[in-house]
């Protein structure tokens, strides 16, 4: 089984997140995409993070279609960091081929994540293009450090079969929805 793991705070979830998940599902030929709703992003203020139940409900509205699963696994595992979650999931499900999914905006700051180099060595990673993030993502410390492990987008369908480190940057139609912009509108409105 080929499973994409799409983690985030989804604060709030929006059509851009759905676009990333759906793009990954199709281009990577995944059987499932699990949206891992983080209890609290360690790089963001807890003051602006909505309650988990509210964010889970928001994700359920966007995670539509066969193979999309919404999970609070990180909360249940007591995991705050992606690297810890990946290690637990890989140990529990050794026959599953996992791929970490992220938007290009996340790759741009990936070097700030705890254990980011270990994440790259733990599972293949798929980066989906996001507006305004392409240059920052492609020149980010993570992209430079793992340039040798970047696969061409034409090989995306077999990325799940790769031995990490392996990653791909997928371009295509862009979706301009943004959690930051949505939060800003809600604050003003």
Curated annotation (Swiss-Prot):
Enzyme class: transferase
Pathway note: Cofactor biosynthesis; NAD(+) biosynthesis; deamido-NAD(+) from nicotinate D-ribonucleotide: step 1/1
GO biological process: NAD biosynthetic process
EC number: 2.7.7.18
Keyword tags: ATP-binding, NAD, Nucleotide-binding, Nucleotidyltransferase, Pyridine nucleotide biosynthesis, Transferase
Keyword Iron-sulfur set for record: no
Taxonomic superkingdom: Bacteria
SUPFAM superfamilies per the UniProt record, alphabetical: Nucleotidylyl transferase
Reactions that this protein is recorded to catalyse: nicotinate beta-D-ribonucleotide + ATP + H(+) = deamido-NAD(+) + diphosphate
GO molecular-function terms, A-Z: ATP binding; nicotinate-nucleotide adenylyltransferase activity
One Pfam match: CTP_transf_like
InterPro entries xrefs: Cyt_trans-like (IPR004821), NadD/NMNAT (IPR005248), Rossmann-like_a/b/a_fold (IPR014729)
Family: Belongs to the NadD family.
Biological role stated in the UniProt entry: Catalyzes the reversible adenylation of nicotinate mononucleotide (NaMN) to nicotinic acid adenine dinucleotide (NaAD).
Protein name stated in the entry: Probable nicotinate-nucleotide adenylyltransferase
Underlying gene: nadD
């Amino acid at each position: 089984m080929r499973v994409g793991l799409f983690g985030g705070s989804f604060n709030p979830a929006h059509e851009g997140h759905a676009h990333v998940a759906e793009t990954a599902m199709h281009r990577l030929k995944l059987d499932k995409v699990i949206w891992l709703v983080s209890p609290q992003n360690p790089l963001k203020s807890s003051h602006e993070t909505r309650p988990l139940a509210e964010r889970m409900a928001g994700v359920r509205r966007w995670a539509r279609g066969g193979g999309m699963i919404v999970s609070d696994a990180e909360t249940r595992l007591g995991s705050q960091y992606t690297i810890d979650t990946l290690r637990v999931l890989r140990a529990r499900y050794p026959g599953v081929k996992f791929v970490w999914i992220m938007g290009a905006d996340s790759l741009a700051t990936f070097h700030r994540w705890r254990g980011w180099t270990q994440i790259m060595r733990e599972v293949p990673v798929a980066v989906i293009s996001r507006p305004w993030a392409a240059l920052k993502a492609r020149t980010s410390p993570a992209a430079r450090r793992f340039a040798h492990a970047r696969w061409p987008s034409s090989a995306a369908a077999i990325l799940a079969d790769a031995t990490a480190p392996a990653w791909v940057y997928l371009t295509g139609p862009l979706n301009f929805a943004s959690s930051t912009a949505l939060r800003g509108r809600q604050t003003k409105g």
